[in-house]
């Protein structure tokens, strides 16, 4: 069983297949991503779907859109089948839904069920909510077996990390919860954290109360359109699967994760004023971390770390108010929405901008306005958004053609002007922020034979203005190819190749010399799941090269890694897994990645450079239906250095080991 999610009582292969697919996508999205993102909310929601599957006879379009392996046409056909033929009597009626292929059905089965729906059902009574609602408490403790240099005199707290999460929910109707977190090195019930945890998140979310489709109080997240104006949700991107290039609007959602930046605090609501028209409004007022000098905000601090006095001085340094709304019309094959947002800083934001960032956000207030749209004509689906603001504009369009359930084509065009500002916008691109980027992306996915699947994509992009380590306007290419072979349910393998070409300043020339860089990545992965076992072997090869400052000699660097993963689920409620990784790279540019199973609602994809190996062991024990205990131990051993890290994070010696523990109580 995948530890980051928890599955209902179905066959091992059925529950593992969609979870392994999700692991693959998250791993690919993590690799090379400059912006760290925690997937806690998304993983928690999918885990809840495994325990409380969606009833297909009462499913809404938004509920089905949370499953990335379902296409828009499959969702519409599934809803139409229930509308035309009435309630399903068995889950196997999925085979009768047009465009629903066997592979998709296998992926969907763990998340759905079929139950009779009574006519005239309304919002549940308070008595039912209190009686049948479910409570969950999740406690986590991380213990490092090393001492960083910062603990000698700079870090203000102990080296332990711990968090506590409580959630009460009743189906999709009501969710209430609180989250507290203390990072390693932060004080606890002391100094600037006299109230205990360094970070707290409170949330209250009601859904489907008559015309009131959603009401959020406390901390919440927002996503509308394609993210050009507003998205604090998990963003999809370029992977070896077409499903991760599509984005479905999340609307208003709770914020229960330990992410200390990507959320709003206040009130938000969505009302269905007409059968086909929804109106949303929101207001947020929150303190944010940053540096304030002479009454001006010079930088925004996003990490949430407050370990040293210097970091603590950045805590709650200024306030940000946000107000805005969205109006969405959706009927049949047409969907049109308008989103607007206005930001107010309590003092001027004047960052000390480098030349490559001279057009970035600054000022005391600004706005964004955008219009998103979606239209389906036969097998064509057109989705897009156009946005503008205080500066610049952005445009994104996707055209997808579904020849059948086995053949798909996708074309994406994006134009993000170099001076377009958005504080909480994320969208498709080489970087997640929709600014200073233009490009065309073409992808094709085909399953011509029962056991074979092919994917290929080509992204040609350009940056109209400078970027970090690129001291001129530049361009690049990103090409991907993957072939997957699945001879039987318990055995699958794939090979993929990725080629990326970009321009970059030559090291040591201060930007005076800029040459292309060429990056080749190859991966082979074999997964075998006999009975209660899972075996997975991964082999990676990286090749990185750039011409020297004179343009004559290529500087070549290489990296390798081999990872072996094994897990076993006992007949009683105990599962164990072990993983070992060997890596050998020439430098940071040729670094490799190896994902590991983490604790519940977490995902871990560390990068490695240099020479060494890492091993980890994971254990899960369900003491009863109410209590679950997880533990993970891991150690990395470097063979080419005597210290790990630098500055306050420096660790003496060549070994880094830690123990993570988690206890969940459900009732």
Where are these regions (language model features)?
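Exposed, low-structure sequence patches enriched in small/polar residues
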Residues: 155-159, 264, 316-351, 358-667
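Internal alpha/beta core interface subdomains
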Residues: 275-282, 286-323, 328
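Bacterial Sec-dependent N-terminal signal peptides
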Residues: 1-12, 667
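Residue-level recognition of beta-strand termini and adjacent short loop/turns
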Residues: 60, 71-74, 101-104, 171, ...
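Compositionally biased linear targeting/interaction segments
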Residues: 7-205, 210, 219-223
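Outer membrane beta-barrel
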Residues: 194-289, 403-422, 573-588
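Surface-exposed loop/turn segments flanking beta-strands in extracellular/periplasmic regions
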Residues: 236-247, 292-309, 597-602
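Outer-membrane beta-barrel proteins
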Residues: 181-199, 253-260, 313-316, 544-554
């Amino acid at each position: 069983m995948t530890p980051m999610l928890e599955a209902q009582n179905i066959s091992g292969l059925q529950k593992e297949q969609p979870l392994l697919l999700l692991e693959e996508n998250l791993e690919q999205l993590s690799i090379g991503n400059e912006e760290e993102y925690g997937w806690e909310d998304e993983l928690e929601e999918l885990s809840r779907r495994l325990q409380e599957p969606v009833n297909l006879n009462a499913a809404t379009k938004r509920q089905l859109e949370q499953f990335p392996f379902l296409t828009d046409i499959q969702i519409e056909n599934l809803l139409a089948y229930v509308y035309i033929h009435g309630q399903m009597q068995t889950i196997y009626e999925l085979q009768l839904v047009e465009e629903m292929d066997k592979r998709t059905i296998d992926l969907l089965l763990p998340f759905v069920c079929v139950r009779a729906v009574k006519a005239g059902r309304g919002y549940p009574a308070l008595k039912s909510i209190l009686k049948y609602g479910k409570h969950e408490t999740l406690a986590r403790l991380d213990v490092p077996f090393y001492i960083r240099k910062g603990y000698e005199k700079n870090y203000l707290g102990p080296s332990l990390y711990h968090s506590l999460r409580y959630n009460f929910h009743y189906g999709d109707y009501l969710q209430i919860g609180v989250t507290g977190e203390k990072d390693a090195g932060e004080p606890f019930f002391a100094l600037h954290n006299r109230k205990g945890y360094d970070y707290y998140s409170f949330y209250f979310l009601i859904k489907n109360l008559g015309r009131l489709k959603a009401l959020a109080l406390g901390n919440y997240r927002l996503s509308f359109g394609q993210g050009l104006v507003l998205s604090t949700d998990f963003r999809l991107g370029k992977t070896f699967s077409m499903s991760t290039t599509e984005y479905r609007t999340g609307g208003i959602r709770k914020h229960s994760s330990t992410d200390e930046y990507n959320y709003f605090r206040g009130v938000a609501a969505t009302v269905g004023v007409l059968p086909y028209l929804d109106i949303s409004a929101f207001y947020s007022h929150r303190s944010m971390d940053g540096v304030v000098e002479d009454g001006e905000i010079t930088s925004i601090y996003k990490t949430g770390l407050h370990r040293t006095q210097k970091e603590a001085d950045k805590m709650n340094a200024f306030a940000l108010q946000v107000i805005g709304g969205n109006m969405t019309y959706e009927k049949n094959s047409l969907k049109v929405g308008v989103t607007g947002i206005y930001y107010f800083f309590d003092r001027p934001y004047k960052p000390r901008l480098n030349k490559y960032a001279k057009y970035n956000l600054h000022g005391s207030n600004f706005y964004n306005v955008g219009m998103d749209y979606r239209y389906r004509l036969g097998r064509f689906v057109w989705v897009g958004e156009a946005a503008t603001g205080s500066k610049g504009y952005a445009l994104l369009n996707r055209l997808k053609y579904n020849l059948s359930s086995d053949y798909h084509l996708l074309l994406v065009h994006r134009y993000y002007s170099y001076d377009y500002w958005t504080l909480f916008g994320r969208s498709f691109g080489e970087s997640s922020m929709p600014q200073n980027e233009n490009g065309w992306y073409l992808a094709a996915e085909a399953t011509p034979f029962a056991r074979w699947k092919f994917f290929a994509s080509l992204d040609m992009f350009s940056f109209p203005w400078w970027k970090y380590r690129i001291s001129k306007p530049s361009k690049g290419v990103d090409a991907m190819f993957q072939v997957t072979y699945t001879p039987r349910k318990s055995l699958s393998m794939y090979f993929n190749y990725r080629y990326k070409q970009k321009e970059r300043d030559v090291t040591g020339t201060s930007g005076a010399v800029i040459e292309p860089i060429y990056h080749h990545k190859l991966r082979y992965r074999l997964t075998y799941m006999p009975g209660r076992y899972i075996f997975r072997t991964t082999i990676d090869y990286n090749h990185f090269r750039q011409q020297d400052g004179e343009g004559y000699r290529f500087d070549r660097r290489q990296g390798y890694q081999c990872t072996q993963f094994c897990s076993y689920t006992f007949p009683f409620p105990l599962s164990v897994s072990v993983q070992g990784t060997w890596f050998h790279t020439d430098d940071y540019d040729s670094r490799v990645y190896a994902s590991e199973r983490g604790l519940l609602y977490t995902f871990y994809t560390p990068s490695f450079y240099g020479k060494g190996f890492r091993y980890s062991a994971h254990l899960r024990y369900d003491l009863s239906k109410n209590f679950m205990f997880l533990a993970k131990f891991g150690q990395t051993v470097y063979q080419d250095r005597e210290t790990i890290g630098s500055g306050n994070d420096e660790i003496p010696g060549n070994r880094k080991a830690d123990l993570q523990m988690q206890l969940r109580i459900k009732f």
